[in-house]
Amino acid sequence: RPDDPVLVGSDYLATPETLSSDIGVKTFDEIDATYAAITGVDRVAYQVQVQGQTVFPVDETYQELRQSLPAIESAEAFLSSHQVAIAQLAIQYCDAAVEDNTIWPGLDFNTAKGTFFSGGNRDAFVEPLIQRAVGHSSSSTPILSQPSYVDVHGEVASFPAVGNRPENLIDRLVAGTSNTRAISKGVCASVLGSAATLVQ
């Protein structure tokens, strides 16, 4: 039997420059699976009729953007072009979710925006969206590696304007000229395209 190899010690010390990150970003297929899980939209099956033609807008967008989405999990390799592609895919998934009304069966997106986003209606819209994105609800224990429901809800639906801080996203959008469907899609896309769904 041969002798065991001699182990050689090293004086190598890891530095911040040589350590790899404990976090990364999801790759293109993970982003797609996450968006499908949050919105309830089946990318391949979702279809609409446009001028008598059947089109598959979510799948077409994904196939078009696939090479522009992150291919590796390294946060250092994340580019601004990745964020643009992520935003486009998030908007397409949210468009399908609102039009198909997959996770908000009790809500009517034809309601006037002032009524739709008032009081309890606002929470009926954001609660399932945020809960699916961060993995817990306003009344359950948060996942320590995720932003809290309260933080995401504040940014999207409840923070008032204070000092230099702007109002929450919904209030800013309701004050503009967009209708309920457009606002809902924008809010949905802001949650989907955020670090809450992309960082792992």
Name what the model sees in each region.
Residues 1-200:
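Composition-driven recognition of low-complexity segments enriched
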